[in-house]
Amino acid sequence: MTQKTLTKLAIEVLTTADGRAKTALSHQHAATWFAARKTGEPLAIGQASPPLRPSRPEKPDLLDPRNVPKRKPGSPAGRIALLHAVAHIELNAVDLHWDIIARFGHIPMPLGFYDDWVKSADEESKHFNLVCDCLESLGSYYGDLPAHAGMWRAAEDTAEDILGRLAVVPMVLEARGLDVTPGMIDVFKKAGATQAVDALNVIYAEEVGHVAFGSKWFNFLCGRDNLDPKDVFHKLVRKYFHGPLKPPFNEEKRAEAGLPPDFYWPLTESGNV
């Protein structure tokens, strides 16, 4: 029997629709990758043709961002809506991390690149399940509310540009999570929702690493091609990200993840010239 390549394992995750099943397979394939790494005989990376969009469950209904109902997070329904939005983000993140492996397998990269994104996909799978557990404890579930249809747009826009993918997904979208998660934690603390607080604290701590992986491999690729990382980052974010970056920024956590202020402040409305 021919051993499966890492890119084929990635596609198995991408083509699994149900969220719980997708994340279970993600955990399984991450364990397979790291077990092989420990033996000193890693799986072949291989090359594959991932789908433009990953398989998704029938629910939630995906709406234009402007049509997703706004709910105040101070109410129980608002807190459920906030958790539902986080679950949707985490499920997309699982697919985004497996997609970067599958889509760019033709680009020679050190094995550490795959270690980092498999680890990230594994952690995002855990995050999705933690948040789903919170939703279920509140009498809801993932799919019970409509969700944002634009989450995969960044992946489609950067499907042929690995530097663009690294710039927009971990270094912009996931970095935004570092800015907003402390406020979400406060919302659930005030409500005495300890399960949600615990889940969000896990997410907050581990997302720093995902942003750092993006920054690390973005800088690696720029260095390999003798490019200036800051200039390339500004160019690619202006090309692929729709609109200015929005402060306030969590400068401490961004710095921890290898993102200096001169990367993101020039891309705000006041600095975007």
Report the location of each language-model feature.
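Non-heme di-metal
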Residues: 1-273
